């Protein structure tokens, strides 16, 4: 007991603990910034097309209806991406899923910038939209699983901040590109491409950076425990959480046992409950009074 107290009061031990805390904090912030870059691309991808809407219609000579569908096509991909992100991350991991999202952001940006027809300009934003849907689900889930409880709220809000910054910088870059044209017209050419195409091309840099940074972050401990990779999970926990790794792993295992995997069909199932039946009958009896003359 006395030995333990001496170790706690030892200045060298306290200094070592402080260094470990600072090192752990820096590592967590690096992880959080890397993951939140997906939120930045979320905002950037959804906003960057705003500066090119009119010019796309002029370049491809399409109707307003077709142009509107081209602009909204990314939302279709976003819905599908958000719907499938959980399924994908449970199979290939959170980090690998974010890498897939980064590559989709990259492909969507290049494809949209070089699209030769309005049809391809509808298809490629769907690819980018898939990445938006992935990012909207994966980054918050990953940050929640890998960050300490004391920082979870702060790091979670980082995703929202990144989205807003992405929207702002996308619109700012659209404006800057227009200023670079001789007549301040987005249809004008800058180098080999029309100005509006550079607006899409500008997303390549943050998308490539996202792909690089994601490869350097650890996998979620929850996913590793779920796949039976407890030693790898323990190594990640020791780097990120100021808790005993074995206790954290035990909690994760317990939560995995008690977790119910929902199915799409459950949205349409009506659970049977006697109390609900009683309320239904009572409400049905009151219905004539409610629906009578007012």
Protein language model regions, located:
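Transmembrane-helix signature of 12-pass secondary carriers
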Residues: 2-294
